[in-house]
C-alpha cells in the first residue's frame, strides 16, 4: 500500500509542478493549457482505483470503534468536515478545480481567493479532508496507515501548491502567507 501511495503521490506532484506545466505548455501549446487540469483530475481518479483495490484487499484489523454517543458525535463532525470541504471547493470554483473552466478558455480567470474559509487558513481543502479522515469513528490498521500517508501527502502537497501560488501571485501571496496560517485555522479574519 505504501509503495503504490508513494508512486501516486510522486506522479501527482510531478504533474502539478509548475516546471512540468511550463515544459509541457511550450511543447504542446494551447491544447495543453486547455486540457491539462481535466486530464490531471481524470488521471488522479484512474490512479486511485488500484489503490482502493489494494486498500480493501489487504488483511486488516480493527484498532478501535468509538462507542455511542461518541460514534454519533464523530460521525456528525465528519459530516460537517465533508460539508466544509465541499463549501471550500465551491468557493475555489468547482469547475475550475476539475479543469472544466480551462477547456472554455486556456487562461481561465482565477484570482487569489482570500475570503471565506481562505481567510482563516490557507489550505482549507487539505485541512477539511484530513479532518474528515481522522474523525472516522472506526479505525482499522489499514485506515490508520492510509490516514498517515494522506496527511503527509496533504502537507507536502500544500507546500508544493504554495510554490505555485507564489510563482503566480508573487507579493500578493507573500502578504497573504504572512497574515494567514497554513493549516490550523485562526478564529478571526
Q: PLM ranges: what are they?
A:
Residues 22, 64, 95-102, 166-171:
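Short, Lys/Arg-enriched, Gly/Pro-containing loop segments at transmembrane-helix junctions
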Residues 24-43, 68, 103-114:
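Juxtamembrane helix-capping/reentrant segments at transmembrane boundaries
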Residues 50-63, 136-139:
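Juxtamembrane "helix exit" motif at the C-terminal ends of alpha-helical transmembrane segments
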Residues 4-18, 50, 54, 78-100, ...:
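Transmembrane alpha-helical segments that form the membrane-embedded catalytic/substrate-channel core
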Residues 39-41, 72-82, 115-128:
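Membrane-interface loop-to-helix entry segments
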Residues 1-11, 107-189:
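Hydrophobic transmembrane alpha-helices
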Residues 62-73:
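Non-cytosolic membrane-interface motifs at loop->transmembrane helix junctions
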Residues 39-55:
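A generic, lipid-embedded transmembrane alpha helix
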Amino acid at each position: 500500500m505504501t509503495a503504490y501511495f508513494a508512486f501516486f503521490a510522486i506522479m501527482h506532484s510531478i504533474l502539478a509542478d509548475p516546471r512540468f506545466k511550463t515544459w509541457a505548455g511550450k511543447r504542446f501549446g494551447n491544447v495543453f493549457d486547455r486540457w491539462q487540469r481535466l486530464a490531471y483530475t481524470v488521471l488522479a481518479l484512474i490512479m486511485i482505483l488500484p489503490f482502493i483495490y489494494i486498500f480493501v484487499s489487504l488483511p486488516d484489523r480493527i484498532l478501535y470503534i468509538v462507542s455511542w454517543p461518541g460514534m454519533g458525535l464523530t460521525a456528525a463532525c465528519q459530516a460537517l468536515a465533508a460539508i466544509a470541504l465541499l463549501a471550500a471547493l465551491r468557493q475555489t470554483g468547482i469547475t475550475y478545480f476539475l479543469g472544466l473552466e480551462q477547456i472554455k478558455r486556456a487562461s481561465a480567470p482565477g484570482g487569489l481567493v482570500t475570503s471565506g474559509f481562505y481567510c482563516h487558513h490557507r489550505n482549507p481543502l487539505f485541512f477539511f479532508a484530513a479532518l474528515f479522515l481522522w474523525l472516522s469513528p472506526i479505525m482499522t490498521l489499514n485506515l490508520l496507515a492510509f490516514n498517515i500517508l494522506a496527511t503527509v501527502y496533504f502537507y507536502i502537497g500544500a507546500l508544493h501548491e504554495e510554490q505555485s501560488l507564489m510563482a503566480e501571485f508573487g507579493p500578493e501571496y507573500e502578504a497573504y502567507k504572512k497574515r494567514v496560517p497554513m493549516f490550523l485555522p485562526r478564529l478571526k479574519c
